Amino acid sequence: MKHKLIALLITGACAAVAEATAQPVTKVTFYSPSVVRIVKYPADMKTQPEKHSFTVIMKPEKVKVKTTDTGNATEYETEDMRVKVDKATGTALFLTIKGDTLLREMGEPQFTMRKGDVDEGKYIVEQSWKLDKGEAIFGLGQRKDKDISLRGKDITLWNVNTYTTIPVFTSQKGYGVFWDNMGRSFFTDNDKGTTFKSEVAEMTDYYFVYRDGTTDGVIAGLRALTGRATMFPLWAMGHWQCRERYKTSDELAGVLDKYRELEIPLDGIVQDWQYWGCDSNWNAMRFMNPYYINKVGDPAYERYLPADMRNMKQSEPRLKSPEEMVKYVHSRNSHLMISIWASFGPWTEPYAELKKIGALLPFETWPRNSGTLPYDAFNPKARDIYWKHLSNLYKMGFDAWWTDSSEPDHFEKPGDDDYMTAAGSWRSVKNAFALVHNRGIYEHQRSTKGNSKRSIQMTRSGQLGIQHYGTFSWSGDISSTWDVMQEQVPTGLSYVICGIPFWNTDIGGFFSWSYHNNPKDPGMQELQTRWMQWGAFMPLMRNHCSSPMVSEIYEYGNPGDWAYDVQKAYVKLRYRMLPYIYSTQGDVVLNDGSMMRPLVMDFAADSTALTRNDEYMFGRSMLVKPVTSPLYTWQDNNGYGHLIYPDIRQAAAPVEVYLPAGTAWYDFWTNERIDGGRKLMRPCPITEMPVYVRAGSIMPWGPEVQYSSEKPWDDLEIRVYPGADGKFVLYEDRGDGYEYERGQYTLTEFRWNDATRTLTIGARKGKYPKMLTHRRFNIVMVGKDSGRGDGAMKVTRTVEYNGKEITMKF
């Protein structure tokens, strides 16, 4: 039946309207021309329920909306989209400006009253939509699935270790839906429709995003809503070494020394857990393990010894305090990340302070049987206490935070969902825990007087919005198997397409039980080598493993051994790509770009590309196909690996690669030019992972270095891949600090006109202190005689550049 329009702002430049149906009230709010919020609540509520969004920080803009009464519906039109609301049912239909259907709601939302728990009086809610038959949709975050498609899937949205769900799906049609509910939720796609369902809410609440029909447009809208990405320091784009765990400062320093001795580039090293001591002292955020503070044998500190260190022997330590360790790492031109958790043992000072204000969550977490409890990150006073203790490590000079177990770990039992946080029941807020936890650390660090470091946090969980708070996710404690590696590629793609640009895995996996924790096992060596190759093309490159495994490159062999040489070569390759990688990060921050791009982002019209779960674009130029199956080893029934070929370096088994249509491609290694729209079997020796460069690409390559800031970028190699027009913007700043937020950076645009074979280097835009004002560019017109992609290529022309525009023909 028809009903009256009950809410406001329906003419001219408007933001919100609300309509009442026989059942729910439908409220339409435009946050921008490309982002609209749809809220529905039962008609017996007099007003819209109040709600705090953990994720959305954007306020509605003043949007010009044209409102039209079409008889049975009211239509709202912005410059980017049209939304039509049925007057009888309140169902919404989303269309392009031309009138093409993007998405339609199916019927009214469902509201089922909760009874018998702390959320009694609220609702279980669900909303369904009708998609086109065969329409591809992606997203929902990090989930262990070898298929990036969401069609036909049933997925629970409840964050645990290795499983970080984001309530976002995007379509090949270039729209996205963000279901703004951080409680236990469910996604279902079947013949009846595509549905989100949440266990606790007072209304359905989602955002529809559509700008220009591209996934880039969707991601820009999501970041406008939840926060633009922040810039990580240059060093973070380099190579990180991590292991569970370095048990003394000297052991950590010795690993760094070995990397420098072997000339394996390195920018970051990680101190894992138990520097605080035993489990009862869990996450004290103080160095109380006597091995780190030269207190071995001191009765006052012996109580803090972890069980696995009680019989360790140590000679007089070289580094006698954590302060000395930090200074030493910095003196060797590296940086130090340290593990911190979202829980505290009963012996710690934070535990006592949090208990006093009622800010500990009373459920069982890890480590079990230790009395350790998570803190209530939803309580702002608890976040203050957390930083109060973490700030001591910050003052020591630590560069980055590893916020482990940020789901947090939870050994669930009946009734746990009824625990109340400062923001509501656990079942209603849990999926936002990592977001508020990391946000608290970021905001406290940013507010610290004299802060000159960019905040960088690596978190095991995540949520839409963490990109705004100096945080990236890793995929959790995964196993070292080929099967797991295969699923990690689509796992990462499903995460980043939700709008969070920075992600990585433990290179080599974490638990190496399947190969008996043996880095000399040929099967483990092949797996580690292939994973390291892939790691060179992740947004961040970090080696890791669990004890008793070791992850250092030199543990896999000596110089001259293939497992050592190939890993080192790819680390060196990563460093030569740093100008490309850092500029791509600049595109992420300034233009809402993405570093790791599922093929739908660039080839949405290519149906074959949409189905590829094992390839992606690294930046806008490079197509990457990780090798995720063993080619040269086999594993026996006892878990031991064996070589198939006596000399693995002589083998070249084929790997299938698909090159998307609509462009030509260059084999990165050989420079062979190949037309797109075809599958091919690429010979794949252990030294090579399939990488292709899109025709029209312009890529800056840097010098060989041992750490990211060792040499200035005053002599860059600029590779041009002919075959299409193209451009690239070189982004530069001082490499750390937040001056870039005030415009202190430079942009240098390179443009290639393929028809005229003309390269233009535009006038430099911007400035920052101590920037290069004069430099040399070595132009490489890539072709079959240019040399291998991983080497120094044959220079076609060298130009001197002082910031003024240069044009040259080839």
How should each PLM-predicted stretch be described?
Residues 1-7:
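Bacterial N-terminal signal peptides that target proteins for export
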Residues 7-16:
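Bacterial N-terminal signal peptides
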Residues 1, 19-235, 242-244, 249-251, ...:
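N-terminal accessory segment at the very beginning of proteins
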Residues 99-688, 694:
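Catalytic-domain carbohydrate-binding cleft regions of carbohydrate-active enzymes
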